[in-house]
A protein has these predicted regions:
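Active-site-proximal, well-structured secondary-structure segments within enzyme catalytic domains
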Residues: 9-10, 41, 48, 53-94, ...
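Noncatalytic, helix-rich "gating/capping" subdomain that lines the substrate-entry/channel surface
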Residues: 3-158, 242
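Hydrophobic alpha-helical segments, chiefly the membrane-spanning helices
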Residues: 303-305
Length: 305
């Protein structure tokens, strides 16, 4: 008799094989492999196109009055970015998170905020070499074919079948219920931001590129709090030490920095992880730097040797 854990492992393993097409006849298995191959290629192309659009956009500002509202540290960073591209005396802003988000949050120049926002939201939708519309259509078509090969009416039900939700109907019921609470709250917040805009007497209507800027102003007005004031408490070193302290409190592990360990980039740090009894758990590589040639995201990978 299998133990409960063994039975669960067997069920999950069996389902994984079924979802990979093990029950399909040979010709359909071959087609499924081809679909998976195409989806992989299309997914990589899609991501690369977005990355290219991120890197291609450059907003140069040549007049200091157009920097109104931007913190000094951000101006200095933008000037250094422009200098690195040979544009001395200008300020460079890009679509990367570290540039785009502070710009939308602090820039008093509404036309430039709009330009920045629209450039970001329209990545892959500019009818150029990086356009993703055809790729999206191909992905949707292939996903549907894959789902139907495996006995599902749509791709979302194929994906959700392996989750707690089980199907798209359950997900939509949950989202619609959540929407009934979230929408009135969002409308109230928008009205509050619009009221703040109206005080300026410009007769402008709240748009997506205004949201961060007026939220920051509202925070200052209501709570006398500026995000800049709390930044020093969230330096990388402080956040990392805080995370390590939480790991120690929750799991009893300690992380000690190691020197002289081979790394794939000079910015990477290496830590030895030990359990509460002092036994070694593993080695933890921390890469905290954002790179322009990589998609902005956070991930943790494990390697067992």
């Amino acid at each position: 008799m299998y133990k409960r854990q063994q039975q669960r492992l067997l069920e999950k393993t069996h389902k994984k094989f079924i979802r990979s097409g093990a029950n399909l006849p040979a010709d359909k298995q071959a087609r499924l492999r081809e679909i998976n191959k195409q989806l992989s290629t299309l997914g990589i192309t899609f991501s690369n196109n977005i990355l290219n659009e991120n890197n291609d956009f450059k907003l140069y500002v040549g007049k200091e009055e157009d920097l109104a509202g931007l913190p000094q540290w951000f101006r200095e960073s933008a000037m250094a970015e422009a200098r690195a591209t040979g544009q001395e005396g200008k300020w460079l802003f890009t679509l990367h998170n570290a540039s785009r988000l502070p710009f939308l949050q602090y820039s008093a120049n509404r036309p430039l905020r709009e330009q920045m926002y629209k450039a970001y939201i329209n990545r892959g939708n500019n009818n150029d070499k990086n356009d993703n519309k055809k790729i999206i259509a191909d992905i949707v078509s292939l996903r549907l074919e894959k789902a139907q090969l495996l006995g599902f009416d749509c791709y979302s039900n194929f994906v959700l079948d392996n989750t707690m939700a089980k199907n798209s109907t359950a997900v939509m019921d949950f989202l619609n219920n959540l929407w009934s609470y979230a929408l009135p709250k969002a409308k109230a917040e928008a009205a509050e931001l619009q009221k703040l805009m109206d005080k300026e007497g410009k007769g402008e209507k709240l748009e997506a590129w205004d949201w961060w800027y007026y939220t920051e102003k509202l925070r200052k007005e209501k709570y006398n709090l500026e995000e800049e004031e709390i930044k020093p408490y969230f330096k990388l070193e402080n956040v990392r030490e805080g995370a390590f302290a939480v790991a120690n409190k929750l799991y009893g592990i300690t992380l000690t920095k190691l020197e002289g360990i081979p790394v794939y980039h000079p910015d990477v740090e290496v830590f030895e992880v030990k359990a509460a009894d002092g036994s070694q758990v593993g080695i933890f590589y921390v890469d905290s730097v954002s790179y322009t040639h990589l998609r902005a995201h956070e991930t943790i990978r494990h390697l067992v040797c």
